[in-house]
Amino acid sequence: MKFKKIILALACLSSPLYADQDQQLKSEIQRLQHQAEDLQAQLNRLQKQLANHKSSQQKHEQQAAAKPAEPQSKPTVKSGAAIEEKYHSSKVEVHAPDAHPESISFYPTALIADNRVVTYIAGTPVVSSPFLGDRPAFDGSDYIVNISSINRDVRLMQQRRRLYRAYQKIGYPIPNMPIISLSGKAEPAATFNNPFRSTNTDGDITLGSSELDVAAALNENVEAYIAIAYDESPPAIGPRVNNSAFNLNMGFVNIGNLDKSPLYFTAGQVYVPFGRYSSAMVSSPVTMNLARTKTRPVIFGYKSQADTGPFGAVYGYRSDTTLGRSGVGGVNLGYIFGFDNDINGEVGGGFISSIADAGGMQSTGANVGTTFGGFGSITNGNENVRKTKAADVHGHVGYDRYNLTLEWVGAIQSFRPQDLSFNGQGARPQAAQAELGMTFMAFNRPASIGVGYQWTKEALALNLPKRRYVGVFNISIWKDTVESIEYRHDIDYGLTQFANGAAPQGFVNLPTLGTGKSADTVSAQIGVYF
């Protein structure tokens, strides 16, 4: 009897619970029925749209089949009739994998518009210099091609560091593929002058120093560089356009990471770090004509990891001259300074164990069978000369819109008289320059003027003037261009002075004689840079 009472009590208590559960189930069933009705309505609408689309497509196909073929010639359009171009704008999206690129071994990326691939972005990116696309210079001076030829490896290493720092700043992964930068220039020029040894005015129009540069940043530590230059010098025989050829101007590999170490290594064909040769003129300074040396060295260098601070390098290469040991070496030291963002500059000096490999020593530009043509001349020279030591001291300072450049370079021992002579004695050639410049705005365009004084000593055999006064006006009328006009006044060595240089075995060159005269030259140049 007790059990019956307990069972009846439980039944009475559980009946409300079952009633609540039944009510919840009924509500859930009604909600699902409403959702099913909505989905069925959407399905009916889509089926109707599909049927309309098929009907419209069949109608267009029937009209196209019934339309006669159009003649191949275009119909004549009445004058003034407007032709409406059909186009539309679409949103472009970048489609990239969610997985890290290293997991799939490449970087597949696509630009998508209207569910179609517009273009794929993959492989090695090729950009115009500078790498970052930062273009502060209207005149194109920030391009690779306009970086100084001396220590270009160091400046490219600094640019490479800025590139990879930019990747880190915006949170991009460091790419494991090369980044190739293209740069170049074309500088057509016209000159008018009255030379030392002629009473007639001479003129010329030439393409000038045109060049194409390729810099490939393989990673944070390694970069390769190649510069192909146009050879404007006339051939020994025939018209000068026959020598319109490109050759390797520079090419090297640089290994270094200034964020990790101030040490670096460079090997290839470069201008050795001896001298600075900075100038705003159209003409090359006499210091460059005398001592700039392009060869194939190995360079071990140090560069302060900050923008300012000390730098240095030691280098060695095989000499083109054949007398004595073939090895030549040198050292370069300097310091870059800056104060309050207004004053900046550089001071430095260098030593080289032989100046005989310099461009101005290897070729003087003399005609075949006349005066000394340089140690590298087949008809007017000889490489069997003694190696002669040289030194360089230079300084550059800029303040606000003004800049001053000073440099001296020269042999610190005399050549043998049979190698290079001046007034019958062994020559000790030297050169110096002083140049003052100022930048300003002209006709709402960036412009600059510069004046300079240059001199040489015992360099008559190298066809260099004794003194030079020079001035230039530069302006960038259009972006990435520099239009220049230069006036140059050269003074030759005296009438009583004479010089000569090494000749082929069994021959003697004609002596180079001073004229005591002056020469005036006007040059106009348009430089285009990219």
Swiss-Prot record:
Region (Disordered): 50-81
Origin species: Legionella pneumophila subsp. pneumophila (strain Philadelphia 1 / ATCC 33152 / DSM 7513)
Coiled coil: 20-66
Bias type Low complexity, positions: 63-75
Signal sequence extent: 1-19
Keywords, ordered alphabetically: Coiled coil, Signal
Name listed for the protein in its UniProt record: UPF0422 protein lpg2959
Stated family: Belongs to the UPF0422 family.
